């Protein structure tokens, strides 16, 4: 057996030490590369690639950067709120003083329909840094989810006080006022939205609802038609102005005119039971019975506890001489109406 000399052994040790010293630098360089690529992907709007790259950067050097926060931001853009929540909880555990992570986590919990938890996180975040108008907007919307409109209005008012040009905060404040039948305040809020954006279809549609509640049908119809025209060409059209226009035409006994906007409402809001109910009712009134049955049955599948849907189904089955089904639906209507009456304070 041959033994290395002392010089040989010291040389090997020196080489090993150099390699050990190089490993952290190589890891750091690799982490920096993945992080930088993630930032580039994020800024270019490639959020799927960004989320993957930030995850790799975090795996290489756990807890040393804000890669988890950027990964969460990427996942929010991808509407993957559950994964975003996981990333933010990990980061907040390692960095409990990060107001950025907490505010984003509060938003994510709101989007997951967890308002109580969202409010708890916003309270923690506010202890670290004062909230922005957008933050207070989400706090207000958490209270909307909790059906607490008094507190919703309180925080939405604070949001627009802090950020008077926050169009979305003004819009949601208008909606909260409308839910409390504070029509004057609601109108002012929606008019403020239109002052900030003169072709905001949501605000114009809601002005139509106010006009309709004030028994001004012609002005309401005009507002709904404006909202439809203003959102035309948008990649994210809402079914609401079509639904509101068609519903008002039905109330005015103009069922033939109501069919077209209600068909468009169904096209845009295929999972909205009200759209199927209203177009089914329009078909029933224009004697298009098979189509009425189809739409009303779809509405019932989407919202089986809605008494109005069961009542219209009973009418269509009776008209089509399906008497057993008609009796069942009339009975179901009475049951749901009795239950609703019994639950009122």
Describe each model-derived feature in a short phrase.
Residues 31-32, 65-66, 99-100, 132-134, ...:
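Helix-start (N-cap) detector for alpha-helical repeat units in TPR-like alpha-solenoids
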């Amino acid at each position: 057996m041959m033994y290395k000399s002392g010089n040989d052994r010291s040389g090997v040790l020196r080489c090993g030490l150099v390699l050990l010293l190089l490993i952290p630098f190589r890891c750091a360089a690799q982490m920096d590369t993945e992080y930088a690529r993630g930032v580039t992907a994020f800024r270019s709007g490639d959020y799927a690639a960004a989320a993957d790259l930030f995850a790799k950067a975090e795996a290489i050097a756990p807890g040393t950067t804000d890669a988890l926060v950027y990964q969460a931001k990427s996942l929010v853009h991808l509407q993957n709120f559950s994964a975003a929540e996981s990333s933010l909880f990990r980061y907040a555990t390692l960095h409990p003083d990060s107001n950025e992570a907490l505010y984003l986590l509060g938003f994510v919990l709101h989007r997951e329909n967890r308002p109580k938890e969202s409010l708890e996180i916003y309270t923690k975040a506010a202890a670290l840094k004062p909230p922005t108008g957008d933050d207070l907007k989400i706090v207000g919307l958490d209270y909307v989810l909790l059906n607490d409109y008094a507190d919703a209005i309180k925080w939405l008012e604070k949001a627009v006080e802090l950020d008077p040009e926050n169009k979305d905060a003004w819009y949601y404040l208008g909606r909260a006022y409308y839910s409390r039948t504070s029509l004057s305040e609601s109108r002012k809020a929606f008019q403020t939205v239109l002052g900030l954006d003169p072709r905001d279809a949501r605000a114009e549609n809601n002005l139509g609802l106010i006009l309709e509640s004030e028994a001004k049908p012609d002005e309401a119809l005009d507002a709904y038609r404006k909202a439809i025209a203003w959102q035309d060409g948008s990649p994210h059209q809402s079914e609401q102005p079509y639904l509101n226009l068609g519903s008002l035409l039905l109330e005015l006994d103009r069922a033939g005119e109501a069919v077209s906007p209600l068909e468009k409402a169904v096209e845009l809001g295929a999972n909205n039971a009200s759209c199927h109910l209203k177009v089914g009712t329009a078909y029933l009134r224009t004697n298009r019975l098979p189509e009425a049955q189809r739409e009303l049955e779809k509405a019932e599948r989407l919202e089986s506890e809605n008494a109005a849907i069961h009542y219209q189904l009973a009418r269509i089955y009776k008209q089509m001489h399906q008497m057993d089904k008609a009796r069942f639906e009339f009975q179901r209507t009475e049951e749901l109406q009795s239950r609703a009456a019994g639950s009122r304070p």
